[in-house]
Amino acid sequence: MMLTELLLVRHGESEANVAAAEADATRALRVAVPARDADVRLSGTGVAQAEALGRRLGGLTDEEAPEALWVSPYRRARQTAELALTTAGLELPTTVDERLRDRELGILDTLTWRGVEQLHPEEAARRVFLGKYYHRPPGGESWVDVKLRLRAALQDLAGSGASRVLVVTHDAVVMLIRAVLEDIGESELLDLSRTQPIRNASITRLVRSGGGWIAEPVNDVSHLEGEALTTEHGGEHHGTRT
């Protein structure tokens, strides 16, 4: 079958999201991340968000429900997917793909922007000059680097045989999958990252239309609003770990 629909989901609020907000509030140089990035868990709110997502998925008809799951190997993404599917009562063939992991920040990992400016002023200057799209921190990735690995992942996903796929991943990956499939360039993508930062446990639906793809809805958190679970953690927008 041809791939016709992607449901892109950012993981629920993580312990690192909470720590990043605290670091910003206290003007800290570093985020007190409780584990290496791949092992960061969901917060209590993140768990509730994942369960609310599951109730949303459980309400889909057979014609709307995903047929397969592709998920980042990072714990917060896997935890979101597992909680959501359990709550929804769905059992899906699952692919854990490292190409869906969060962007690697290299020497800037766990730093707030204030920390980058004070501890690595030369990288702060390079980031300002090159812009977020092309800047590659030492030991890390630019957005373009992430796009390259996502192009390969999307080719494999398209050949997997499923027509509707749930993808649980990270905010930068959601934006960059849109960039690949909708052919969004640097300027428009940076505008989207500023004006529409991807929210925790949000759903962005991409549907094949003619020779291209259309996103509708984008960043949907209606399943969280009734339960007062919407959180604002800008992730890539603020330059902190997501």
Task: Give short role names for the model-derived ranges.
Residues L3, E91, R151-I214:
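Active-site-adjacent alpha-helix immediately C-terminal to a catalytic or transition-state-stabilizing loop
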Residues G54, E82-L85, K147, L154, ...:
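Non-transmembrane alpha-helical segments in soluble domains
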Residues M1-P66, Q79-L90, G210-T242:
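An N-terminal RHG(E/S)-centered segment typical of histidine phosphatases
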Residues R136-G159:
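Internal catalytic-core helix/loop-beta-alpha segment
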Residues A48-A125, S187, T195, R199-N200, ...:
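Phosphate-coordination/substrate-recognition cap region in phosphate-metabolizing enzymes
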Residues H11-G12, V71-R75, P93, R99, ...:
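Short, well-ordered beta-to-alpha junction loops that form the rim of enzyme active sites
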Residues A32-R41, A125-V144:
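Short glycine/proline- and acidic residue-enriched helix-loop micro-motifs
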